[in-house]
């Protein structure tokens, strides 16, 4: 019998991705203060945040697999997380439109039964449509982008504002299923163990 699979995230999109892939996670939100960490580059930061979230939750479980994730968007040398307000989301979209961004998602999988932690980061290039100000205002007014890294949700209305992706689409939603499969296999688990 495999250990309990715990998702250390409040993200409904991550939970939905896992469920669609056949994994029914227990959700335990870390409440980790993301502003307490800094790093030299985006990859190091998303991995550190994912590991901190997973570690905070893993300390509460004796026998579990705990997955922590964190996503950030890099556009023109600027790193973006969730926008703090509608005004910030509008300004970001005015900067991002017509540009290509790099969406990084850090994954940390802690296996409490083996006392091991594996980390890996996914990168997907996002080609943003050159949308007008009215579209930006309407999109931000919908409220959808306010809880998303980079101020867009690929799986929602934001998907209409993306021209193309280079890389893993689930990574953009906040959890790369191919990376999760790889991490599970490296820890000695089969996908069917969780179906």
Swiss-Prot record:
Subcellular location: Cytoplasm
Cited InterPro entries: ITPase-like_fam (IPR029001), Maf-like (IPR003697)
Active site: 70
Coiled-coil regions, chain positions: none
Protein name listed in UniProt: Nucleoside triphosphate pyrophosphatase
Sorted UniProt keywords: Cytoplasm, Hydrolase, Nucleotide metabolism
Any GO BP: nucleotide metabolic process
């Amino acid at each position: 019998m495999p250990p309990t699979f715990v998702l250390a995230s409040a993200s409904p999109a991550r939970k939905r991705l896992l469920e669609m892939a056949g994994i029914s996670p227990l959700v335990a939100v870390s409440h980790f203060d993301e502003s307490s960490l800094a790093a030299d580059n985006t990859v190091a930061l998303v991995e550190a945040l994912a590991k901190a979230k997973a570690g905070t939750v893993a300390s509460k479980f004796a026998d579990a697999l705990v997955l922590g994730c964190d996503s950030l968007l890099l556009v023109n040398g600027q790193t973006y997380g969730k926008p703090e307000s509608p005004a910030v989301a509008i300004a970001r979209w005015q900067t991002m439109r017509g540009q290509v961004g790099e969406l990084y998602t850090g994954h940390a999988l802690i296996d409490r039964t083996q006392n091991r932690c594996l980390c890996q980061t996914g990168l997907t290039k996002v080609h943003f449509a050159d949308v007008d100000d009215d579209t930006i205002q309407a999109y931000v007014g919908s409220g959808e982008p306010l809880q998303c890294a980079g101020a867009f949700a690929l799986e929602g209305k934001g998907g209409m504002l993306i021209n193309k992706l280079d890389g893993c689409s689930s990574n953009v939603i906040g959890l790369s299923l191919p990376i999760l499969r790889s991490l599970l296999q490296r820890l000695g688990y089969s996908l069917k163990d969780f179906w």
